[in-house]
Amino acid sequence: MVVGEVAVETQVAVIGGGPGGYVCAIRLAQLGKQVMLVERDPEGIGGICLNHGCIPSKALIHASNLMDSMAHLKEMGINDSGVSIDANKMQEWKGGIVKTLRKGVEELCKRNGVEIVFGEAHFESSRRVGISGNHEVAAIEFQQAVVATGSVPVELKALPFDGKRIISSTESLQLREIPKELIVVGSGYIGIENGTMYAKFGSKVKMVEKAGNILPGLERDVVLIVEKRLKELGVELYTGTEIAGWKEENGKIVLSGTQNGKPITISGDKVLVSVGRKPNAESLRLQNTNVQQDERGFIKVNEKLQTTDNRIYAIGDVVGGAMLAHKAFMEGKVVAGVIAGGTAAYQNRAIPAVVFCDPEIAYVGISETEAITKGMKVKIGKIPFSALGRAHTMENVLGFVKVIADFDSDVLLGVEIVGAGASDLISEAALAIEMGARLEDLALTIHPHPTLPEGLVEAAEAAMGKAIHFYSKKS
């Protein structure tokens, strides 16, 4: 390695070590390319997902679910002696999981021949990036580059982050004291997940949403199931509410705004602002390249994820679309194939999405509403979880499985699941859609009994008018 101001040369520079970046770097190395992976987080690679998002949040959600389940033990004949939370111990446990996975990813990079460079990258030209904060590498000259810098939380002017009282999703996963009253502004998937989690930990949660209902954009029948459960957990829902400002009063944060046009105040100990994310591209100095961005700052790419500068590619949150780690995984593999000389192209056909609330939500393909809006003629099959024996044995009968299929061909177009284990069930649906499966392909596949995946069989049969374990009158 060259030390000082002389640039290091590599075939491909990957900027950002999150899900898209490290997967792309490893696959490039597997395909014979010399790769340098630049990561600005001194703690290690993994990005928001591994360090401050997907992994730590699911660990804490798992802990909250275990705590919530304790409330139902007596119904099963199990007597408990009471449960309490040690938030510091919980953070140590969560941190251990993150550290283990991060070390594992770094080791995979090294074993595959990916060189990791810690520092912040910025473009000096379409062939060179400068590196700040690294004493060994000042710059990297590349033949191709991949931008995988992810996204950052959107900040509201009325509620600027201070990292202590008004926090983002990052800080919400690092709290060493469970807040007595937590206000969650924004009821998208991050807000819903965090709000549900803290409600189970014992916080009085107040959820604020500008739209007319929580989880805007999702099907109403899905949302109603989650609303019911949130109310059971004591969560207060303030829909149609817009926050204009805040003040501190008697040790509390008091938000002021309007709900459906009428003045309202909401008080709490902490405020989690979760109103979306924006591309993390401001420090890249893209003006030194031919890379173009759209009006929202997302990097423009074609079907090969190539930017308007033909030497530079971009993947993951920074290009927009569904901000999902598994989407970034696939984009990283596609770009690696393209750079290595393949003919791969990115196709957004079946990207599953999951909300780890209670009950879980998972969906893939088109929704029933989307199909109707597009004037498509479809078949719908819907089975409640209460029709599944396994759901009863788990004390989780809230929810349903819905399939959407083309009316004439029976080709599967979409699946929506709300219920226990939805995050695991959706993968079979994604595979079915990706392979162009028809309703009978699901219906005729023998599923073990009693299991939750039987819901997919029953829903497919319902769409065909042949459901066994659920009766609905034929229209």
Where are these regions (language model features)?
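FAD-site-proximal beta/loop scaffold in flavoenzymes
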Residues: 162-179, 265-339, 432
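Beta1/beta-strand and adjacent pyrophosphate-binding region of the FAD-binding site
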Residues: 6-18, 178-185
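Glycine-rich dinucleotide-binding loop and its adjacent helix/turn
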Residues: 54, 149-204, 208, 233-237, ...
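Short hydrophobic core segments
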Residues: 13-15, 121, 140-150, 185, ...
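Glycine-rich flavin
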Residues: 2-10, 27-178, 211-215, 221-222, ...
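Conserved phosphate-binding and hydrolysis motifs of nucleotide-dependent enzymes
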Residues: 16-21, 150, 186-191, 276, ...
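Flexible, glycine-rich terminal cap/loop adjacent to redox cofactors
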Residues: 15-43, 48, 55, 59-66, ...
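Short glycine/serine/threonine-rich phosphate/pyrophosphate-binding segments
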Residues: 20-24, 166, 191-194, 200, ...
